[in-house]
């Protein structure tokens, strides 16, 4: 029972090596008689990432979160330029919305590559490669003279940038314990939302200024490069199998005994195993696992709502309220940011006061993740109806902007606790569950902005947002049912271990 309690690895999503992470932190030597198999020298091994000092763990987490902010920032900053670029390239605003959608579509495909690479080569090599190429693809966006170049560059910067989103959650699991890991992941999750929320605000002021829309790419490239260099100079490798492989290589050179080897040397994942873990099994689980299906639908909805709002907010504040400045019209996004930070704080408190004591007493079950999600499921429709029905120009802008707070809280808490629940439920096949969730979620996030303009123009801000509110109400029973009946449903699963 204790092994299963310590096993859950919290993450935001996306095909990182969660399945291997559950066995890595123990630091215990295997009972096999192979004296040349290199393992950790017990749980207090100074090279074990779990034994990094607190300051080092915190610094690594902050750097990881900063990289995440700039990747997700890039996904939304271009939304502020949709209007002006539609005129420059002689297409509709809906077509230019593809600039945002294609980046999020890159988030869909990327984890299928970066997740396996992190298992084979460690965390840092694929992270650095992907992040560097993400930075490079800002250049064709900034200098594009035709629509095709612009759209292709937006897709590929999403594809390569998602190396951070795919690898960092698993890297955090390498050096944080179960309770502290949940708090570290909350910081990472907040970063995944802070970036896209700031994108339209900063992008709006850039487009309004004399710099022009092309500087939305340059302003992403400059700080992303700066923090990328800091990461390159400071981040250590944390993936346990690769560290042990390096130790084995070092021992071979020092002792001239060529028999020293690590588990990764003798059990390198095959291409077929990787395909099974990241593609075939996720598709199979989407057909067979009701918990995965329902949670994926719910998380995909809130992810789609977030990216839909990059279109809806300018309509609500520029068109309906007649705010002229793109930057000023994007400032109400700060309401969502406040909600995200409040949600992050509430999840951290709930983890400390509710989840951690149960974990310590050995009485924790996956459903203990769900109470904050149930609260969030109620907050989200409240915020959506609040936003929609305070959109009239005859009502002050302040109530509509404040409505972003419960929306942000709802999105963050549903996201975090929903993904944590999936990981706790599926444990050994957590990678496959997260790959399935990432695939569907990112596809929905890419699709929602494409119909947002037509929906809001046709229905109006009030009824269009109310439609989202009704959809979110329909989702409320999901965490409630799983809280009360999740154990019985898990007992029927082919993939969930017995708690």
From Swiss-Prot:
Which GO terms of the molecular function aspect are on file?
A: transmembrane transporter activity
Q: Which Gene3D superfamilies match?
A: MFS general substrate transporter like domains
Keyword set includes Plastid: no
Which keywords belong to this entry? Glycoprotein, Membrane, Transmembrane, Transmembrane helix
Q: Where would I find glycosylation on this chain? A: 361
Gene Ontology CC terms: plasma membrane
- CDD domains referenced in this protein's UniProt entry, alphabetically: MFS_Tpo1_MDR_like
Give the residue ranges for region: Disordered. Answer: 1-29
InterPro entries for this protein: MFS, MFS_dom, MFS_trans_sf
Transmembrane stretches, start-end: 58-78, 95-115, 124-144, 155-175, 187-207, 215-235, 291-311, 327-347, 370-390, 395-415, 443-463, 467-487
Q: Where can this protein be found?
A: Membrane
Q: Which PANTHER family match?
A: MAJOR FACILITATOR SUPERFAMILY (PTHR23502), MAJOR FACILITATOR SUPERFAMILY (MFS) PROFILE DOMAIN-CONTAINING PROTEIN-RELATED (PTHR23502:SF47)
What does the function comment of this entry state?
MFS transporter; part of the gene cluster that mediates the biosynthesis the mycotoxin citrinin, a hepato-nephrotoxic compound to humans due to inhibition of respiration complex III.
The entry's protein name is Citrinin biosynthesis cluster MFS transporter mrr1
Q: What is the native source organism of this protein? A: Monascus ruber (Mold)
Q: What is the lineage of its organism?
A: Eukaryota, Fungi, Dikarya, Ascomycota, Pezizomycotina
